[in-house]
């Protein structure tokens, strides 16, 4: 059993690293740090990088354990932690933690999750599994019946739960699509950063619903043509585009998982900057939503696995 007062938890994705100093008993976060994403670090540099980032914590506290989720456990990370297959009780992740090489303390990496998606293809996640586990702990009603969860981000995850077990999920590339189109296409070219325009976002959501029979690929250029026709201010073009993409994401996922979502709200797990957009879109589409804080749930999920792995 780990007798230290604190341990280090890390959510280490491709682009960013978030480190948490966590109380071993309560699971409360005492401090945070950030660092480079795993794509910016060589695997053999990771132990020294963590030592530098965590040095103040290590000097002040008796810390002998760290645990990580995300792309740190991929083939481009510190060590390949593999995947566990669905259907999956996420508590079983604690039995398959991976120990990376050359660690400066006892360290473990949480595996990812793999499934056959509703379209029949293989799909995978890394990092989101801890948020889902945290959501189940925070909202015990997820242990009973069928529920649909949405975890927005660069690659959104739509997750079907049945009695607290992950049955399947599917990925939508909404975040990456929006980023690519706003940075590398003519659709929003010339638009300057401005305050969020709620009405034009809603217009995009409604348009995505009105033209539900039309493929999204045939709607996207309206972001440009509406500007040329005087129907859409250039400064609001990104908000209209966001509404189109998010609206269609919600509609498509709810169609795929129509039997999962019966009589239940969609749980949106993300930072408020994203979850608020999905909730607003859901309001326009008559899709009820509940928003949960992604970072809080990630810490809760990691802490649950920490306690299981250390027999607390």
How would you describe each model-predicted region?
Residues 57-122, 163:
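Short beta-strand-loop/turn "lid" adjacent to the catalytic site in phosphate-handling enzymes
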Residues 29-65, 73-76, 80, 189-190:
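N-terminal phosphate-binding loop and adjacent alpha-helix
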Residues 6-45, 292:
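Short glycine-rich, Thr/Ser-proximal phosphate-binding strand/loop in the N-terminal lobe
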Residues 7-11, 65-69, 147-151, 267:
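Short glycine-aspartate micro-motif
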Residues 41-42, 115-209:
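Glycine-rich phosphate-binding loop plus the immediately following alpha-helix
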Residues 280, 290-312:
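Glycine-rich phosphate-binding/hydrolytic loop that grips phosphoryl groups
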Residues 209-252:
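Adenine-nucleotide phosphate-binding core of ATP-dependent small-molecule kinases
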Residues 16, 262-281:
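Glycine-rich phosphate-binding loops at beta-strand->alpha-helix junctions
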């Amino acid at each position: 059993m780990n007798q230290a007062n604190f341990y280090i938890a890390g959510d280490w994705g491709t682009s960013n690293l978030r480190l948490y100093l966590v109380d071993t008993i309560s699971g409360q976060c005492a401090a945070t740090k950030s660092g480079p994403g795993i794509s910016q670090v060589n695997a053999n540099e990771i132990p020294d990088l963590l030592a530098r980032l965590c040095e103040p914590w290590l000097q002040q506290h008796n810390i002998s354990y760290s645990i990580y989720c995300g792309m740190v456990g991929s083939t481009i990370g510190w060590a390949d932690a593999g995947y566990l297959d669905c259907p999956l009780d996420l508590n079983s992740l604690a039995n398959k933690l991976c120990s990376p090489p050359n660690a400066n303390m006892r360290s473990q990496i949480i595996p990812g999750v793999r499934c056959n998606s509703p379209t029949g293809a293989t799909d995978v996640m890394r990092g989101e599994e801890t948020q889902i586990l945290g959501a189940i702990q925070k909202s015990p009603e997820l242990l009973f019946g069928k529920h649909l969860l949405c975890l927005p981000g660069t690659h959104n995850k739509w997750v079907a739960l049945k009695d607290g077990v992950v049955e399947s999920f599917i990925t939508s590339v909404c975040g990456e699509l929006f980023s690519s189109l706003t940075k590398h296409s003519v659709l929003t070219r010339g638009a300057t950063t401005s305050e969020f325009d709620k009405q034009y976002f809603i217009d995009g959501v409604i348009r995505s619903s009105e033209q539900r029979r039309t493929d999204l690929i045939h709607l996207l250029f309206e972001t440009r043509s509406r500007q040329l026709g005087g129907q859409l201010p250039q400064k609001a073009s990104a908000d209209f585009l966001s509404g189109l993409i998010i609206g269609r994401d919600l509609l498509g996922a709810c169609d795929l998982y129509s039997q999962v979502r019966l009589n239940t709200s969609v749980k949106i797990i993300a930072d408020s900057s994203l979850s608020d957009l999905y909730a607003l879109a859901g309001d326009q589409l008559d899709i009820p939503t509940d928003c949960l804080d992604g970072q809080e749930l990630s810490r809760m999920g990691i802490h649950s696995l920490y306690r299981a792995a250390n027999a607390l």
